[in-house]
Amino acid sequence: MPTPHQLLERFAGIKLAVLGDVICDRFIYGDVQRISPEAPVPVMRAQQEELKAGGAANVAHNALTLGASVHLFGIVGEDSWGESLRKLLAGLGLHTEGVLPVAQRRTTLKTRLMAGSQHLLRVDEGVTESISAEMENALLASLRAAVPSCDALVLSDYDKGVLTPRLAVQATKLFRDAEKPVICDPKPANIPRFV
């Protein structure tokens, strides 16, 4: 049986396609020194803000950190969060040509308020409705072009509407027809679309 180190060595150099729900994780760090007089809630003084890759983008970043070359495919809105996230992802070294900006959709944003090590609150923004057939087709065209240069596909489902049943089936077919493995990480309620 290979050791963990041997497994990591095998992972280095793999070329992955990651398709799924691209999320912008926003962290606001601060400190709490009092309770609000308006309601029994803490008042946090914001001191620092940080954006991180979330959802499928986090999966892609983790694979990149382990030594893989990663092509990310997903949807962001044509908004400031989408633009900031695409810049962040490109700066990390991910191939982001497959992260498509779409005017009809807001970027999925999860804002976490952190006081020290205490997670005070999370605010989620964005839509969870399934993407349109037009968006599915655009992602499939982008993914199809990447199949020859990728060794495997990871489907990363966070139930934000990108991995529709049709897109999951068609993306899987592209890689299976090329005799390349497909790895699925679905939300439990969505498992039937990946079987």
Predicted segments, located by residue:
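Ribokinase/PfkB-type carbohydrate-kinase core domain
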Residues: 1-33, 48-56, 60-195
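Flexible glycine/proline-rich, aromatic-decorated loop/lid segments
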Residues: 34-38
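Divalent-cation-assisted or electrostatically stabilized phosphate/pyrophosphate-binding catalytic cores
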Residues: 40-47
